Amino acid sequence: MQLQGKDKKVHFIGIGGAGMSGIATVMLEMGGYQVSGSDIKRSAVIDRLENLGAKCNIGHKTSNINNEIDAVVYSTAISPENPEILETQRLGIPLIRRGQMLARLMKEKKGIAVAGAHGKTTTTSMTALILEENSFDPTIIIGGDLSNIGGNAKLGQGEYMVAEADESDGSFLLLDPNIAVVTNIEDDHLDYYGTRENIAKAFRQFLAKLSAEGLAVICLDDPVLKEITTGLTCQVVTYGSLGSGADYQIKVLETRNGVNQGEVYFQEERLGMLELHVPGYHNLLNAMAAVAIGRHLNLDFEKIARALRKFTGAKRRFQVIGKVNGITVVDDYAHHPTEVKATLQAARTSHPGRIVTIFQPHRYSRTKQLFKEFGQSFTNGDLIILTDIYAASELPLEGVHTKLILDAIPLQEGQQVLYLPTLKDAADYLADYANPGDLVLTMGAGDVWTLGRELIKRLEEK
């Protein structure tokens, strides 16, 4: 179905979600669309969309769907039994996957798509900021809010679109970008892919879609990526750590005054210094992908570095929620062992005091597949608090419980691990036992982010 012409009516099921809201925002700003949507609860994102002209309903109901709607957009987070899905099918209204709609929007621009198991949102945000700060006026669709643009999306008048490419359900294969980034490949979303080999095959297909004039930006620190990029017909530029053999290499320097620093080299030529106000080696690597794109678009390194100095992070990516009574509260989306390990490493390098981490496992399937790896990822935590699993759209699996992760943690001297089932239990405990000098770090892809706000409130009331 071609969504062209005046006042086409498009309905989004789960419009407040990170990926859905970005697409809805761009369509609202384009004009020519009447956008409606539904979500299970009101949020700042819903308020923002309504201010742009969207009609949003709270709750998924059959009555939200009618014959005047031209198309309904949904994501894999929406159950096939959702009443709005069923009503859409009954009325014969076209159902469009979120990835299909993103692909349609990208066809109107020169697409820059960022894929990978980890670092997508940050790398997309950094790339978007570089283009935004250097007058490219890109269209942007990100999986997290970027303070520099006041949200997670914007319609630009320039020729480029920068977007996050979601591999979780294979929908990134619908995209036809001009530039594609792959940050890394991991054993994630095995509920969809089945095997690691299938994951690697999908990323290979993603890169193989690039034309001869296209550009693949690849992290050479990932051994799987080294293998799957062989024989690509597009242009390939690589980035990685010092000594990796990549085109762009980063020499990590000591963090000073909270500034994450590194020297950037291109084929052994020193380009200059990179300074980031977000911690962690993984963020320096993310920045290297953005540097490679900026240079491909003929930007001087100093202009790129200047833009990145303004980067303060994306929402829920090592986001400082607040500081009260000497206690710093930070929130991060980390929900895979590699992300948990990298986030705690960033916390350790940037914070001299005790690190208290609250981790909410996300999905029963992921916990079952990776509980041993999760157990090994908490090395840099001093006090580790584990809560019950956030189910997302899954049903419980027999024998799968947070205790699997707890039992897999090899306790080090001075480390303490607690199981506190609910976020309220964790908030009650931390309100009494968090100390001045602590960094309290909430991690997970569920609703654990609410804990940081609640803790700040409790500490302010003390």
Curated annotation (Swiss-Prot):
ATP binds at residues 116-122. Its EC number is 6.3.2.8. GO terms for molecular function: ATP binding; UDP-N-acetylmuramate-L-alanine ligase activity. Pfam families: Mur_ligase, Mur_ligase_C, Mur_ligase_M. InterPro entries: Mur-like_cat_sf, Mur_ligase_C, Mur_ligase_C_dom_sf, Mur_ligase_cen, Mur_ligase_N, MurCDEF_pg_biosynth, UDP-N-AcMur_Ala_ligase_MurC. It is an enzyme of class 6 (ligase). GO terms for cellular component: cytoplasm. One of its GO terms (biological process) is regulation of cell shape. Keywords: ATP-binding, Cell cycle, Cell division, Cell shape, Cell wall biogenesis/degradation, Cytoplasm, Ligase, Nucleotide-binding, Peptidoglycan synthesis. It catalyses: UDP-N-acetyl-alpha-D-muramate + L-alanine + ATP = UDP-N-acetyl-alpha-D-muramoyl-L-alanine + ADP + phosphate + H(+). Its main location: cytoplasm. It is found in: Cytoplasm. Pathway: Cell wall biogenesis; peptidoglycan biosynthesis. NCBIfam families: murC. Cell wall formation. Belongs to the MurCDEF family. This is UDP-N-acetylmuramate--L-alanine ligase. It comes from Desulforamulus reducens (strain ATCC BAA-1160 / DSM 100696 / MI-1) (Desulfotomaculum reducens). The lineage of its organism: Bacteria, Bacillati, Bacillota, Clostridia, Eubacteriales.
